[in-house]
Each structure stands twice: as structure tokens, then as C-alpha cells.
């Protein structure tokens, strides 16, 4: 076995170049952001939340039979470590091995922005951001489709399934999905009754694994041959934050041959899912228990779209897809031979240069995380084309009508196109992400003064900002809900709260210079007065003298939060005395190497600290120290020397990129802060 250490987070297409092959060899590549991930049979994967125009699995197998260059079909999103294991009893001479990068890959000290201090830990912390924005920002054209369209149908390699947007818009229920499939290797997979996200009834049909084509590392316990396997959730195996129930297995008394066409149908009926193979019923799968969690899944066990995608290293062709209603009417037909299929199933090639939340996961354009990205990119790579590309990408999906008119999706998937915006209405969740997106635009303008680049988007930006103003509660003056959306969800804190109100005041202030530069003085005045009114409301309604800081919200006056303190300071609502008092109050949130998010949170060994909101706090501490000469040194050092230092001080878990959510830890023990998915939202912050 060979173990490769790339030294820091990298992303791209894995490749190997050989100069001598004694006979056909099978090589297993395994990837991990941390070294310890390589000890796991499936690495630090799979990633089953989104397709991401990348490999969902962190293990892939290569069959090398000739000398020369071999490259993976899939992008591996982000990793520092890689192992290479020879599976066959033969030999191979390797000339080179590595990743064909999908983005910029420059040493941190050679970037346009780089910080050097007398403290090596701080230097390494700052470098985390420069690393992440290089691997998480992807150039247009560098993320091709994960499907291939042929004259026989869609050639689909094993990955998280991709769902039909047409099926979502049809609101199909109690239907029969039928299709033709040819297994090239291992198996073929499909869904029915699914959300646009890959969650819902999932079926996998395995082949007979012929000796001349099967990989030696196929897990035949998880994937027995000639078997129909079913799971009702995300995948066949657990992913760290997406647990799944146990699989159901239906062994077949027939041989499922590879390189032969098979006809499959799955019918959603009252007593379960009826599955036929070549006209013979092979299983009746009982309906899963009803679920109250409709955040991503279909609202009914009988309703939802369909999708396709098999498991690790499997390949199949899917064609002649047909959906028939319970009354026998055909409601959908697709030979799967047109390039339009890629758009419908959300796997079209990337057509914008954009920044994702992270290279490995979620590989979505999260507009809330975008704010962090702007700040970090400004201090490191200065690749402004990624920022304007992300702005254009998000705004192209802007909602025109309805209660959320003006909003944009909070987590646009790679591979989608605006014509299917309504199939994935993520704008209904975490409404304060709209504010963070607007704040990111304001910061971009502050850094660049790019009037020309933003002018064509000004009407859309203004429309979103005006839409958010309607979410100010007229009775409290705080940010809450609108008449059409009275109870929205937020990320930073509850409605009528210090965090969401402070953020929106901050956002309004940032947009004033942009409005003035666009010659829109009336709008600039409105934004300015809105920000002023929000600051007054925070102090009038949420400053709690007995608590000596800002209350979490009107509904929870006895609690306070890290984000409420941060945004009260960043918005300018807090004066010097209020800021000093709030900083002292942080000691009550202190936990391990960081701070709890909310005062009422219970401490436990599984509590996950949050670098994302802690980044807002760190910035607030720096700014308040400069503006009001507050004594914020202890709190600042606690974050730098604890939370962020834990990302760089243990080489077994350090990837050279920032973490999303380390668990409670002290930063010194062997197990300290070892859990952390690298995402762009988690950067070191500050100018």
C-alpha cells in the first residue's frame, strides 16, 4: 500500500501514470481529509446529500491493463490524504500519481494576500482560508457532468442518485416507473417517491459479478450478487450527519447478467412498492413508516419524483424511462438520449465560475456561506471572478412571484439550470441567508467598487433587499416574518431576535454605498433609515440590563447567544459599555476551545462548536476593540488559540483547510477536535 500526503487540501481528478504493467491490475484509491479516514473501509464518505458533480464515494477502483495515463471519471472534492492498494496478485510500475486540479492551487505564501506574524499558529490559521477558497471555488467548465449521454441511453456510474425535476413539477403519485437498463459492472440503482434531494425509496439491483469484470474489493456482505437491495432514506450506508435505517435484502433465484438489457418496473401501491424484473415480480417492499421530516423528502410515501444512480464502482445504462399513472395514463416518457436529460436530472456541466461551501461537501452554492467566502477571498486569492460568478449564478434563480418573491435559493446545486428553479424551492428555508448573501454583495462592492459588474444585477439586488424589508415586524421594529410568511426559519437566531435584526441592520448599511453609486438615492435613503430603525429597536427591545447583554429574542428574554452579541456589535447597535458588558458575558458561554452558541444549550461530549458563527464573533471582537477600546483580548485569544488552533495543531486531523464543526475539545489530547468537515463557511475571519 502507498499513502500519499498532499500536505494540504486538494481537489481534482485523481490520476495514475504507469510505465510497466505485468498483467491487468486492480488498484483501490481511498481518500480522506484526515489521515485517520484511511483506516475506514469507506474513507470519510460517502457523501449522499447531493450529487455535487463529483464522486459521492471516497473509495474507487481502477482496472489498469495498459501502460500510460489513467484518470478517474469523477472529481474528488477535497482531501489531503490518499492511499493506493494493489488488489490483484500482479505488479505495476507507477511513474506518477496525483490530482488534476479543478481550481487554483497556489502555495499560501505566494497568494496576493498573505499574513506573516511572529506567531506560527496564527500564520497557519490564516492560511486555512486561502487554501479553502482555492479548492472550493471552481472554474466554469472544470466540473463536467457526472452522466454520459449516448445513443443507447444515459451511462451512469455509481454515485448519489440524481432526480428528475420534471417528476417534482408533475407532483406524481401512485405511479409505475419503468425503464430499460444494462449493467456494465456491478449493479443499477433507482428511486421512486423521492424528493429532489436524494432521499426516499432507493432500490439497487446487483449483478452476478462475473469473474472477468468484478472488482476484488466489492463488499459482498453489503452488496450480495443477484439481489435487490432497498433502503428508504439517503443511501445503503450511514454518512456522518445523514444516518440511514437498515437495508432490506431480496435474494433472487435468477441470474442478473451483465451486458444484457433488462426491463425494470416499480409500482407505488397501497401495500408497498411492487418491483418487476423482465416481467416477473421479484419483490413487494413494504412501505416505510410515515415520516414527519419533510425538509428534504417527499411529503408522502406515495408521491415524489424518480431518479437514478447506483453504488460505488458500479456502472449501468438507463433508457426508455416511462411513468404511468394509476389509471394507466402515461405521464412521462424519456429515451434518455438527449443532452436535455442532464439539465432535467441536475447533472449538467458547470456553466459559471462559482464558490461552493466546501470542496468535499456540501458542494452547493450556499448563499449564507458566501459572505465568509467574499471576506476570505479578498484577503487571499483576490479571484473576484468567482464572486461575481457566484452572484450571477444565484440571482439567475431569483423567484418572481409568490410569498418569497425576490428571494434566491439558499443552496443551489451544481448541475441545475434556472428553468427548473421551482423544482427545488430552497428559498423557503433559513431566510437570514438572504441577508448574508446581500451582505456579501455589499462587501464585494466595498472591496472592489465594481459598479460595472453589479449594475446589470442592481434591479435583482434591490428586489431581494426590498423583499427582506417586509420581514420587519411593524409592532416590534425587529426582524421576524412577513404577512405572507409569518414564521420563517433562520440560521443565526430566532425571529424578533438580536442576531437576525443586527445582521439585517449591518446588511442595509453595506448596501447604502452601492445604491448611491447606482444613482438610486431614494433607495439608499430607505436602506439607511431602515438600518437606523433596526439598531434603535435592538436597544429598545432587546438590551437587557439585568442580563448585562442582549436578549436572544422577545420570546426568550432570559437567554442570550454568541450570534446575538456578535451582530449587535457588528451592526453598531452596541455602544462601548454595552459591548464591554457583552464580551464579559461570553465567559458564561465558554466551553472547551470555543463558545456555546446559546446560553441555554446543554454541555455534552457531543456538543458541536460552530466556527461559522464564531467567525462573526471574532470579527466583532476585533472591530469593537478598535472602535471602543474594549478589553476583548481574552475572548479573541480563546478563539484563536483554541477553536482555530485545533484545526492546525494535530497533524492526524489537520487537512490544511478549515473545519465546519469540531466537537467540544481542549485542543491538546489525542482526540481533541478531530471531527471536522472542511467547508468554506468556516474561515478565519477579519481584515
PLM feature segments, named:
Residues 6, 72, 360-363, 377-381, ...:
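Short, charged/polar micro-motifs that form catalytic or ligand-binding hotspots
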Residues 111-119, 360-363, 374-379, 494:
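Second-shell loop/turn segments in exported
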Residues 47-54, 302, 425-427, 602-607, ...:
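Glycine-rich, flexible loop segments associated with nucleotide phosphate handling
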Residues 1-357, 405-409:
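Extracellular/oxidizing-compartment recognition motifs
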Residues 198-202, 366-422, 433-438, 442-687:
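Active-site core of glycosidic bond-cleaving carbohydrate-active enzymes
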Residues 355-359, 422-426:
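Internal amphipathic alpha-helical repeat/solenoid segments
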